[in-house]
């Protein structure tokens, strides 16, 4: 193989852990792992380590969990490791300019979109919601901007009509490690060819919110169906019935026009709950009332048919 590089890995969630796993099998030398501090989780709010920390400790790697990399003493942790390159995957902390310049080959990031489209925090969800035909991963050289660095390598995959953010996440978690290992080989060999991002093609993937996931019936049925897939598994699209939130897991578009006001229930049977939208009809197929498990519309109608009387309007 190419030169074995001294690598610092920085990441936090499962998506990052899958990249660390690929690095551990690549023959490179992982000299340190940075991940976010343990966070309260679950009903008991017990402090839980990140997936990256669990994996790193299992492999006996040194783990660092600073709250910030701005303090000089935390930057010194990076400097002392004398890395050739720092690999950053969904770390969640800002890397100051001083840290970016410490490794011999700089810092590289695995981003879940085909840059310069969808810079920012939620590229997977935004690409789905926008109706993009494809997405992918970009390995880029990091600079002080938000996903503005030169691109080193890209891999793409189609977005299907059945994809959710969950399934796309898994696809990109397969592509990312492939692109990362190839990029590291090119950096080690001196064959990497950085490409400047075209600023005229930039779009931004803003962070998601639960309120944003509330179904807006004035949108088209096609937009709402994509929204439902984009927000699955988090934060989940939802509507309000009798003052309680009801999550929507799955829906389809019925290619028929209607003059009914957006939000009006047109039909409610075992084939689905058909609702008028700003353009077209959305057919709700799987839903989850508060405190219950996700269920088919047929099961929901058996217990809550009074919620879905044709002619009534959903909020």
Swiss-Prot record:
Keyword line: Protein biosynthesis, Transferase
InterPro entries hit by this protein: Fmt, Formyl_trans_C, Formyl_trans_C_sf, Formyl_transf_N, Formyl_transf_N_sf, Formyl_transferase-like_C_sf, GART_AS, Met-tRNA-FMT_C
A Pfam family: Formyl_trans_C
GO cellular component: cytosol
E.C. number: 2.1.2.9
Keyword Transferase included in the entry's annotation: yes
Class in the EC hierarchy, top level: transferase
Gene3D superfamilies: Formyl transferase, C-terminal domain, Formyl transferase, N-terminal domain
UniProt entry tagged with the keyword Ribosomal protein: no
Top-level division of the source organism's lineage: Bacteria
GO molecular function: methionyl-tRNA formyltransferase activity
PROSITE patterns attached to this UniProt entry: GART (PS00373)
Amino-acid positions noted as binding (6S)-5,6,7,8-tetrahydrofolate in the UniProt annotation, renumbered to this chain: 113-116
Catalytically driven reaction(s): L-methionyl-tRNA(fMet) + (6R)-10-formyltetrahydrofolate = N-formyl-L-methionyl-tRNA(fMet) + (6S)-5,6,7,8-tetrahydrofolate + H(+)
Protein task: Attaches a formyl group to the free amino group of methionyl-tRNA(fMet). The formyl group appears to play a dual role in the initiator identity of N-formylmethionyl-tRNA by promoting its recognition by IF2 and preventing the misappropriation of this tRNA by the elongation apparatus.
Family statement drawn from the similarity comment of this UniProt entry: Belongs to the Fmt family.
Protein known as: Methionyl-tRNA formyltransferase
Source species: Escherichia coli O6:K15:H31 (strain 536 / UPEC)
Taxonomic lineage: Bacteria, Pseudomonadati, Pseudomonadota, Gammaproteobacteria, Enterobacterales
């Amino acid at each position: 193989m190419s030169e074995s590089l001294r690598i610092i890995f920085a990441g936090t969630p499962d998506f990052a852990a899958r990249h660390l796993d690929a690095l551990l099998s690549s023959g490179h030398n992982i000299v340190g792992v940075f991940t976010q501090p343990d966070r309260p989780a679950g009903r008991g709010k017990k402090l839980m380590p990140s997936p990256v920390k669990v994996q790193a400790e299992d492999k006996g790697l040194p783990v660092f969990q600073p709250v910030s990399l701005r303090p000089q003493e935390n930057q010194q942790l990076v400097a002392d490791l004398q890395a050739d390159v720092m690999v950053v995957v969904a770390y969640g902390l800002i890397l100051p300019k001083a840290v970016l310049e410490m490794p011999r080959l700089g810092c590289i990031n695995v981003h879940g979109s085909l840059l310069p489209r969808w810079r920012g925090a939620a590229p997977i969800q935004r690409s789905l919601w926008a109706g993009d035909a494809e997405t992918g991963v970009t390995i880029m050289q990091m600079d002080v901007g938000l996903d503005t660095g030169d691109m080193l390598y890209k891999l793409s995959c189609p977005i299907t009509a059945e994809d959710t953010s969950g399934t796309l996440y898994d696809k990109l978690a397969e592509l990312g490690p492939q692109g990362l290992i190839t990029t590291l080989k090119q950096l080690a060999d001196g064959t990497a060819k950085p490409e400047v991002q075209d600023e005229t093609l930039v779009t931004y993937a803003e962070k998601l919110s639960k309120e944003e996931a509330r179904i807006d019936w004035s949108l088209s049925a096609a937009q709402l169906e994509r929204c439902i897939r984009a927000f699955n598994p988090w934060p989940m699209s939802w509507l309000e019935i009798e003052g309680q939130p009801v999550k929507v897991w799955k829906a389809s578009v019925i290619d028929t026009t209607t003059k009914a006001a957006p939000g009006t229930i047109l039909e409610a049977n075992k084939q689905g709950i058909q609702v008028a939208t700003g353009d077209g009809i959305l057919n709700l197929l799987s839903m989850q009332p508060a405190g219950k498990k996700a269920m088919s519309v047929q099961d929901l109608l058996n217990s809550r048919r009074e919620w879905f009387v044709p002619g009534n309007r959903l909020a």
